[in-house]
Amino acid sequence: MKYDFKNVERFCQDKWDFSVSKSSKQEKCYVLEMFPYPSGKIHMGHLRNYAIGDVIARYKRARGFEVLHPIGWDAFGLPAENAARDNNISPEIWTKENIDNMRAQLKSIGLSYNWNRELSTCEPNYYTHEQKFFLDFLKHGLAYRKESWVNWDPVDQTVLANEQVVDGKGWRSGAVVEKRKLSQWFLKITDFAEDLLKCLQSLKNWPEKVKTMQERWIGKSEGATIEFEVVGLNKKLKVFTTYPHTLFGASFCAVAAEHPIVQDLKNGSSVVIPVLDTGIQEIKSKRENDEKIGVYTGLNVKHPFLDKELPLYIANFVLMEYGEGAIFGCPAHDQRDFEFAQKYNLPIIPVISSAHLGVIPARDQNSYNGSQCQATQMTKEAYTGDGVMFNSEFLNGLMVSEAKEVIIKKLKEKGIGKKTTNYRLHDWGVSRQRYWGCPIPIIYCKDCGTVPVPEKDLPVILPADVEFTSGGNPLDKHPTWKFVDCPKCGKQAERETDTFDTFFESSWYFAAFCSEDKSIDKDACNRFMPVDYYIGGIEHAILHLLYSRFFCRALTKCGYFDIKEPFSTLITQGMVCHATYKDENGKWLFLAEAKELIARGTKVQVGKVEKMSKSKKNTVDPNFIIEKYGADTARLFVLSDTPPEKDMEWSDDGVEGCSRYVNKLWRMVMQLKPVNMHYDNKSVTGGLLEYRKKIHKLLHGLTDDLENCRLNCVVAKFREMTNLIAEIDVAAGKSLIDEGICILIRVIEPFMPHLAESLWQEIGGQPWPKADESLLVDDTVTIAVQINGKLRATIEVAINLPQEELKKIAIDSVSSKIDQNKVRTVYAVPNKIVNIVI
């Protein structure tokens, strides 16, 4: 007798229909996995991600919650546009075909989605709402346009947000990012920087690692803004610093290559222009973490307190995106400044005492240039610790913390500085020079300027008749779509041809799911949000999760709903990993290829276990596993051995083991039919009572595990329960077996829904089982019996047994090992231990 998983799964999937109502009086539970990009094919990471969410959703339904568990498609993006260029196919057609394929694959897994709420971000009925959001953001001062230096990806030919630049390269293309000055639309995420930072502490069910990553990205810094007078120019150079107390140790100032003062110099007639041009190109080619390099501008700035001038450099480690795009350099107490001073032979002036420098009060006694410092105690690094100030006039003798406050006060009194809070976070540039994205609803008129598209004219829909024969944005070259009458004056004007960053769509989709028509229904959003369980990869910790938190605040400000935080519990599932293989020439091999070579006696290099990836050929196709073993086996395996947040290693043997368990459970229930739903085992005694206690303890434990998303522990417990039930004698304990089976089938349902549904038809249904509390309390305890401090036996006795009785039972248990006449004394600790001294 074998379980026919194919017919069972097909039957269940055709029958299932999961709906949700905003008017239900039941407590809500919103479960959401990060929606996928429609690449056309699911991978094992998808399977694990969605299986985790489905277990939670099915469990919560069983506990009586009104569960919202939707699915959709993050459908805009560059891959569709590239596919259009490569295959001469419309991005829309390519995307919709992929969605159809992936929808069928997801349904084959048996996921309990509210399919009637399915959405796709490339549909006009979805992005019309975000165009309206943008217009409202404009009204509320949360969106603006300006010319600014942007990150330009030369391969994808589009702008990238700061968050999309990883180690100086484009997050998608891997190309070295360039700096360009373009007019861009921005969203004012900085308006919420402090709130985004503070509210991280309220996210009790988020991984600490994610909160730390966001905290560092927001990057709050307390310091001062200082104005330096530029010698020979009627200009002030503003510098933000978190170390204002080291100002007396300053030996240079430096600006970013994109700083306005650099452009002023290039527009002038200075003799240093040729040198500047060459130096700036070299600086731009070097990333922040590379060797510290710079070029002297030919300008100096006046020290705010001393009668001296500081040379002004352009340096690669100064970022326009941070602070004012300018620094003062104190090499003695900043490592980057120290390396720069060594390279360019600049003075190194300590102003904070330390153990390796000592306190030297006279300024000239401890001032070195970069080459001289090689022969001093300061040979390797700057001193960045605490200490007492010296070489600093009115700061001498003060501790660092006090010196900061004093110098900020002095700067303010002189009108050349103030206390400042700075954030690493910058406003989000949302303009992208791509076709396959949501059009930005703006019109440019020569007479009226920048004109928002009237709400009645939304959505602005992408034209279908575009050409992808050349690079760049096809919307720029469109002969008709680009041109439109101005809504104000009626004259011919031009549309904005940039589209929104695709993170715009994914920053609010969770709110769209709350209503069936994909609109933002305030009552529905307030009913279902925040998302109770949000499941996805930790790679989204900064980009998507931070933008989503911003969007909730922005939409709340605009009156759409009253939710500040989008996600209550965040589960960042680990990756699915597999061993890697190479041939003798170092070429990556699929597992099947490796096995074939090994069978022929050819040497194969077995590499380390790594995340499944197409490039390393260590992938396993979920469709193959589902076709061969069934969806329940695939689901069970990806949930079995590893906590959801940890990486899991793929194992063919593990899949086989899960398949055997599925078939074993099905056969066991079939052999024990009929199952009596009306069992009564409250009066069982002896061995049957012990079995019943164990079953209910497992039920209690796995329910607690489910509440805390310890899904691998749940699997271990219901497999143990299966073995317990199989041990019970049918003749003596059929009623207890019936009880065990009813409990077991109910608790496996979130993990193996098709199998559970099949068995349900045999035994009927029931709500989530509740453990009998009276069976969870032990009435006996195991006691260790020692002889002269060494363990010799264990005994099972009643809890709180009187000491004298406990001693007697303990002595009897080791009577064969001692001469009772030689017992000197017996120490007994109730419920714990007995020690017999002889």
UniProtKB/Swiss-Prot annotation:
The keyword Ligase applies. Gene3D superfamilies: HUPs, Isoleucyl-tRNA Synthetase, Domain 1. Pfam families: Anticodon_1, tRNA-synt_1, tRNA-synt_1_2, tRNA-synt_1g. A motif ('KMSKS' region) lies at residues 611-615. InterPro entries: aa-tRNA-synth_I_CS, aa-tRNA-synth_Ia, Leu-tRNA-ligase, Leu_tRNA-synth_edit, M/V/L/I-tRNA-synth_anticd-bd, Methionyl/Leucyl_tRNA_Synth, Rossmann-like_a/b/a_fold, tRNAsynth_Ia_anticodon-bd. It catalyses: tRNA(Leu) + L-leucine + ATP = L-leucyl-tRNA(Leu) + AMP + diphosphate. One of its GO terms (cellular component) is cytosol. One of its GO terms (biological process) is leucyl-tRNA aminoacylation. A motif ('HIGH' region) lies at residues 36-46. Belongs to the class-I aminoacyl-tRNA synthetase family. This is Leucine--tRNA ligase. The gene is leuS.
